[in-house]
Structure formats: C-alpha cells, structure tokens
C-alpha cells in the first residue's frame, strides 16, 4: 500500500510540515503544477525523487497567468485523480492553497522579469502570462524553500524565465529542466490535450513532426529560414494557425540566423480548433 502524502492548504500547516520534512537536513525538491496531472508530471516527480530525499508537489491553478479571454474557468480540475497519482508515486507533501491564500486581500506585488521573458515568443501573444508565472513561482519558492525545483522543457520559455529569475534574485533554488514526455505518436503531453477533438488530436502530431523535420534539415546544412518555411507549410496543412515558429538560442532565446550562433532550439505555438498547443525541439 502506498503511503499517503501530507496535504496542506494553509501557510501555518505548510511550515509545520516543512519543519518535519527538513529534519536531519533532508534535501527538498519542488514540482510546481496546476494539477490535471499526466505522465509528464509523473516524470518530473520521479526525477525529483532521484535528485532529493524529499519531494513536494504544489497544485495551484494560478489565475494571475490567465488573460480574461483565456481558459481559467475551463481549466481541468482533477483533484481525486491527481491525488491518486501522487500517492502512487510516494510524494511526501502536496501544497494545495486556494487563491485567497496565495493572493490575500490587499495583495499588490508582482515580480516582473526581462531577458527571456521578453523574447517575443509567448510574451507576444500572452502579455500578462510571465508576470503571473514569475510572481506565483517566486511565492512558491519563498513558501516551500526547496533546494531545487523541476520544470518540464515543453514550456521552454517559461523554464528559461524561471531559471533567470532564480539566479538574478539569489533565491537559492536550483531550477532543473526535464525532457519533454511525448505520447507514442510524438505529441507533447499537455493538460490541454484533453480539449482536442478526435480529428484534431490526430492532426496535432504535425507540430512535433514539423519541428523534427526542420531540425533534421538544419543539422544537414539547410538554411534555418528555408527549413522553418517547409515545416510551417506542413503544420498549416494539418489545420493549425501558427502564432510563431522560430529558431532561438537555447539559453538566451535570442534569434539565431545560423548554427554558428550557438545551440539552437526550435519553438512553435499554434492553434487547432480552439486548442492552443506549444512544442519545441533541440537542433
């Protein structure tokens, strides 16, 4: 029988639980989530268990990172299933605050970052997103005080933004990126995949196929612009409307013109039906 994790929903209870977990100088890893957990989240938990002696998972659907026209109300809430997954993985602690705990009356602060947060990717189409992400992640780091925190590479710009924030503000948290977990047909696992109709689910694999084809052509010596144009045609033909499909420096997210400019990451965001998906691959 799996040991049940400690579930806390208030800051005093969190502090008491952390004091217990931290006994004997145990190292602590945090996996921040918004719930609706899938195998990608589970892979983060398993990596966390390899990297630290204790693992905490936060589940908080952060209203501050959703614009008024986005899917906050419709975002899947699957507490029972999430708890079952985390219990099976023998997580030590679940931090599950509500919005009033995270943003109490009179809350008037925000962490705003530059650098990767202004790369012209997600920030161009979701201008309030990273202000919401950095603020809530900064609060989670202050509340949980982990030694390390794990984020998936699927949200690649977010990973770079959070890592930059942690370094710049001397937060004492090592931000660790984990490889994208994909379905058997290549689609990157995402809580939003459940929004896809059967037809759109089948077509959605074009995102990964397009990225991998472009990466292959760039590695073979084709110009980046030409490789991306071919992949854009493939993705558009599958029914997607592309927000961006770009080659960026894998660390700074600055635009790159050729492989000589440094390690390259190809990133895409596109909508099929009403579902917006993101993905990326290394070159």
From Swiss-Prot:
Keywords associated with the record: ATP-binding, Cytoplasm, Ligase, Nucleotide-binding, Pantothenate biosynthesis
Residues binding ATP: 34-41, 152-155, 181, 189-192
GO biological process: pantothenate biosynthetic process
Active-site residue list: 41 (proton donor)
Protein localization: Cytoplasm
Chain positions recorded as (R)-pantoate binding sites: 65, 158
Pfam families (alphabetical): Pantoate_ligase
InterPro entries in the record: Pantoate_ligase, Pantoate_ligase_C, Rossmann-like_a/b/a_fold
Gene3D superfamilies given in the database record: HUPs (3.40.50.620), Pantoate-beta-alanine ligase, C-terminal domain (3.30.1300.10)
EC number: 6.3.2.1
Pathway assigned to this chain's UniProt record: Cofactor biosynthesis; (R)-pantothenate biosynthesis; (R)-pantothenate from (R)-pantoate and beta-alanine: step 1/1
One GO CC term, this protein: cytosol
SUPFAM superfamilies for this protein: Nucleotidylyl transferase
Residues annotated to bind beta-alanine: 65
Subunit structure: Homodimer.
PANTHER family: CYTIDYLATE KINASE/PANTOATE-BETA-ALANINE LIGASE (PTHR21299), PANTOATE--BETA-ALANINE LIGASE (PTHR21299:SF1)
Family: Belongs to the pantothenate synthetase family.
Job of this protein: Catalyzes the condensation of pantoate with beta-alanine in an ATP-dependent reaction via a pantoyl-adenylate intermediate.
HAMAP family assigned: PanC
Full protein name: Pantothenate synthetase
Lineage, opening ranks: Bacteria, Pseudomonadati, Pseudomonadota, Alphaproteobacteria, Hyphomicrobiales
Protein encoded by which gene: panC
